Amino acid sequence: MADPLPINLVVKFGGSSVATADRMMEVADIVCGFEQTTVPIVVLSAMGKTTNLLLQAGSEALNASPKSVGSLHSLREIKELHRETAERLQVDDATVDDMESLLLQLTQLLVGISIMQDLTPRAKDSLVSFGERLSTRLFSAYLRAKGIPSKQYDAPEIGVITNDNFTNADVEYEDTLSELRATFAGLMDGTRSPEIPVVTGFLGRGKTTGAITTLGRGGSDLTCTLLGAALGLDEVQVWKDVDGVLTSDPRIVDGARPVTRLTFEEATELAFFGATVLHPLSMQPAAEYTDGAMGVRVKNSYNRSAAGTLISKTRDMMDGEDLVTSIVLKRNVTLVDIVSTRMLGQIGFLAKVFEIFNSEGLSVDVVATSEVSVSLTLDPAKTLWERDLIDEELESLMNAFTGVAKTSYRRGYSILSLICNVDKSSEILERVFRVLGRESVNVQMMSQGASKSNIALIIRDDQATHTLRVLHHEFFGA
């Protein structure tokens, strides 16, 4: 008998790809349809809207009596979805028992939230973890029911180590990569019987507390690239519900089309400035811990034949082509203006400015400076629990600048980001401002980062959708 092949691919499937029992069956067909020489690890998100339902259940539990928690609509919906899925997939009794145990633990956690009348960040992470823990158990059991050896793994237990910043934890890379390598060493060197590992995405373990943490919205993408980097693979695949990374948001721009190639830098900028197809930090393991040797391919689980998008360290930039790769929109940002003549020639002024933002717990996106002023944008917290900045937070920020600088803020703006060849910025901006002038759109602020791949324009929210469409037509003709 031939020696077992080592793991040579990591594939991640998002929530929409595993939203129902039928979708899980489709994903299983994809996994089983790889060439015989391909041995994958499968990373899964929670089923469909499960994460949102878990968040809703947590909020509802705060307003419910402990005795009524079991009848919460969101909790009933979660139980119904997973029980129906288990029945449709015809999983074994042991998996059903495991599922019911998790659903009981979920109910008990919600009762505790109701009793304590508190939903701490730590409790939130524990709460939403049930989505991935349930989906992976059901999917792994379905593979086994089809006669395919498979084992389920919870990422917090196999080595995804983070700090203890609950709801948006940062990965401890050296610890994580080492532990993941150790976990799967037997499957890499052929000393263990071949099986398809099915791993929870999105979850980690706090280094100090040992508690479950989460990696922020879309964190399963990061789990995927972490595994690929740890195992030294040539490629990982992130399967979504679109044909790869697109030239714009297809929900806004009808003519958005797939981008064939991207660099890690371009993909990171896209994710950070509004493209929801990838987690902003998911490129970091590939770019920094494989020396750029690992590619990330984005594929469509609803359209397997689509080529998708390959993201790599470098790509060819055809002269005269690829002026703009994609245009993305981030809405509902706040614009802050800081003015002080003390900036003139003063060492450390900007450091003091950013220390104030740090002490206020506010994240800065885009920055533009002049001799006596700084303008920047603030974004809602980049976590699973996104929300609007509230007036009290902004007023606290204004007060923190008392005696330092004159500060004001304006709400209701959007960041329109052109992921582009900045070496051609003169041509790009000439065309951009010609269109904006024609459409009577005023730019409140502009920033061109050191990355050489992004130009950010700050415009009013109420003009953002139309502006995105006309600029997309200008550069992509659709």
Model-derived features with residue positions:
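Conserved beta-strand segments of alpha/beta enzyme cores
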Residues: P149-K151, G295, N442
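A conserved regulatory-domain signal marking ACT and ACT-like small-molecule sensing domains
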Residues: S305-A478
